[in-house]
């Protein structure tokens, strides 16, 4: 099943794309698997392609393969901050955000794989990995991040008592994942520096049937990142832009 997509936003102007998805059952498995593809191009020369899926394998011992991979190329404008020393000779000692933006190019590819194994009917535990390869071409700046390679390893725990994965009418879904990531040596004015990241994500949903055709649903979702490197006053992670202005601050 596929549909065309047309959208408009002030950040990306007109966007044109397509979304495809397929549902199927793998051998010896009652749960339904899904594979999705989507891609978009904007009139500001921003574009991305993305593929993701949730596959169920095994008979009585069910395990999942959840994956997400893609590539994006998003020219954008980065509004950095200035420091005291930048304008010390001019007598301006304030700290704040620069009024004039800096054009830059953000190109990144990513791969996320999770493989939870069901230890009983509702609980699954398994490993996960997250890989990010990014290239930031920032004009008129002393910071070079070219390329940035980050590899993260961790684990995921999930609980799923929903009566239907795609159109649930009752049940609870809870998922917690934690990863630790390492980057390659990043070139900065003071030398080379590696970055260590910790990421904690949680997703909690509940579906409560109120009547025959009315369902109350709520969701809590959060993602926390910790980053450690010695030179703290240099922003090694600028905004990673997405179409429509939904930026991700790394």
Name each model-derived stretch.
Residues 1-2, 7-149:
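Gram-negative/organellar outer-membrane beta-barrel architecture
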Residues 16-21, 122-125, 163-167, 230-235:
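Short, functional N-terminal and low-complexity linear motifs
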Residues 18-24, 51-54, 155-161, 202-206:
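Short, well-ordered amphipathic alpha-helices
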Residues 153-158, 164-250:
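C-terminal outer-membrane beta-barrel translocator/porin domains of Gram-negative envelope proteins
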